[in-house]
Amino acid sequence: MCPRTVLLIININHWFYDKNIVRIILTFRLDSGHISDICFINKNLANALITADISLLKRHDIRCTKYIITYYQRYRNKEKGKFISLCKNTIISSSV
């Protein structure tokens, strides 16, 4: 049985706009190919989830091992609890 949603964990290189951000976690929908959720991991606040500024993120061509991200939605705080639990069961881990 193939999962409908996978997580992509992207390690951030020096080119990203905020040097304190070390990782982005994206929820990737296999049926539509879209990103449904996004959160940032800040190295100064261990495992802190920070609401994404999508306008800044769109300026970069972020490439994963198998996917080119072309669609973004703003991370929704009301789903934060569910999203954290998903992060603990990561299926795919990719690096930029």
From Swiss-Prot:
Domain of life, source organism: Eukaryota
Protein name: Uncharacterized protein YAL063C-A
